[in-house]
Amino acid sequence: MSGFLIANALLFLVVTAYAVYLFVYLVKTRLAYIRLGQKEQFDKRIKERLQAIWVNVFGQKKLLKDKKSGMIHVMFFYGFILVQFGAIDFIIKGLAPDRNLPLGPVYPAFTFFQEIVTFLILIAVGWAFYRRYIEKLVRLKRNFKAGLVLIFIGGLMLTVLLGNGMNLIWHEHGLSWSEPIASCIAFLLGGVGKTGAAVIFYIAWWVHLLFLLSFLVYVPQSKHAHLIAGPANVFFNRMESAGKLEKIDFTDETKESYGAGRIEDFRQSQLLDLYACVECGRCTNMCPATGTGKMLSPMDLILRLRDHLTEKGAAVTSRSPWVPAAAFRHTRGNQLAAASAGSGSQEAAAALDYNPSLIGDVITEEEIWACTTCRNCEDQCPVMNEHVDKIIDLRRYLVLTEGKMDSDAQRAMTSIERQGNPWGLNRKERENWRDAASDAEIPTVKEMKKEGKEFEYLFWVGSMGSYDNRSQKIAVSFAKLLNHAGVSFAILGNKEKNSGDTPRRLGNEFLFQELAEKNISEFEKNDVKKIVTIDPHAYNLFKNEYPDFGFEGEVYHHTEVLAELVKNGKLKPQHQLHETITFHDSCYLGRYNEVYDPPREILKAIPGVELIEMERNRETGMCCGAGGGLMWMEEETGNRINVARTEQALAVSPSVISSGCPYCLTMLGDGTKAKEAEDQVKTYDVAELLAQSVLGADMIMGERP
């Protein structure tokens, strides 16, 4: 027996060392691929980053947004960590028979706990199998790779239980309360005898070891690379405002192109995202583009970028992405690595011509322009991947380097550049919306200065509030409420320009920066300290992105200011409205800035209002379809996003659909028309509803467009 044990131990060391070598090689290979990306500065906010690890890795916060899948993963995650101690104990039993972890009197409790955890993991395996292959969740893939990990995990659990059962027979330990499942197995298979039990034990032991080491090698070259890349991605995730876009330095004369035209144009943190992807499909499941039949799928976009990075990385670094290399010699990645290294067959050498276009061959332009930048994908991602900034970088390359843009979007860009608004209306008519509110005091900054008066807030009206007839009524309602509450404010009037959100989200960074610099100059010239706006897109820009260009000031959304005025008693809702209202969360107000409560607090304060929530509300709320510059583009594929969102609102039978965004209100208003429900269901901004309740009949609400 001693000779067998020596041979067994030597073989164990050789096989384990080889598996560990392959694992280290694969991790270093993926790191080499990631390093092809653009370097970036790391802010070293270690404490906050460790807190993110604690909350999202160990706390599984984002995973638990989907309770069923989240609980399965929690069982896998903690179960797999805990059973590793049992695996060590099992390996010791194979290397030194009748030995175990030196836990003394605690050992029986340890084995009992291990068996319970092992049993729970087997339940989780069965549950996961059911969800994927029987319930057939649309967002989950059902290929061989998807099932392989269930085989690995299930095999690991079954072999350790079988091995422990045989160990009881082999060493005549007898049945034990501390190993209930192993004891059942020993009872059922007791007829095999000591020798038979020893043989079966070592078969189970080696199968368990091979499963474990195969899984170790499989992890870095599969979707389970997220076990390594996921925590790293959470740690290195941006600590600043969600969805904030990177500034392009146009003064850098060494740049030959802008945006991402090649995979290596992405930042290294963006490339880390690709290997962190869990392939859970939650992003795609929530995407408004995917849900309405568009070509874009956030998960598929990440996976195709990942596969392209792997192949490009193999060609550039000569490191084979798939090992053992002999088993994967026909894969494209390994052929590219062999060709790059100057070795391999003629077939491999031909693969060196690998040079697909990132935009066109890997990701289509149709996908790039389908994104509404709503960030529902990012909000759902359990490993904190960022999809939107990659799409914007692809748009930047198309617009700034290749000069490509949708014709309708280009028309809006030209109008913004020439007249400061997407319609191309006369810039000198920007303040004319005040004419419809002769009974309200809406001074310009110039008029206030002329009278020697000061103002607390600069009211940024925005292009929608200034030119769109329906949105002008929101601006008027808000202005009258500020007047009623005694809040001093002023507008820039004809000096106001477009905020730049549309150009930036459509990829025209140059125009955005030009507008931002001019707007900031105007703010500084007029000593602006506080800005309030009815436009969530401008709100997000001023609050989170303008500071990159030197802006310093407080920024508020109009619902934040109104909620505070109601709370302080300066605005008193007193007239009953008798409406059943459902509130639509603007993406740039909600997911980008987590402003969910103020508009709801306002609606709840209005007498006679019953507030009912849509199934998808707050952080899971669906986009109206206007974001990302799509307000100015036609939807040519699938169903209209605004109609889909309107259907969700109509499903709860409201009399009013409310919002805190002029873009959303326009899209939802069009949606009620498309569903022929405009006579039964009205669309109003929160400010309009509050004005009606505070001011009563003296305040005529805006009619539906």
Regions found by a protein language model. Name each.
Residues 2-127, 134, 265-274, 296-300, ...:
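Iron-sulfur-cluster electron-transfer modules
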Residues 277-283, 287, 301, 371-377, ...:
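Short cysteine clusters
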Residues 22-40, 93-96, 128-147, 162-177, ...:
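Juxtamembrane/interface segments at transmembrane-helix termini
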Residues 94-109, 166-200:
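Membrane-interfacial helical/loop segments at transmembrane boundaries in membrane proteins
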Residues 243-299:
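Non-transmembrane accessory domains of multi-pass membrane transporters/channels
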Residues 74-85, 149-171:
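Hydrophobic alpha-helical membrane-insertion segments
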Residues 461-557, 588-605, 609-705:
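Cofactor-cradling patches in redox/metallo enzymes
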Residues 14-21, 122, 154-158, 199-235:
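Alpha-helical membrane-embedded segments
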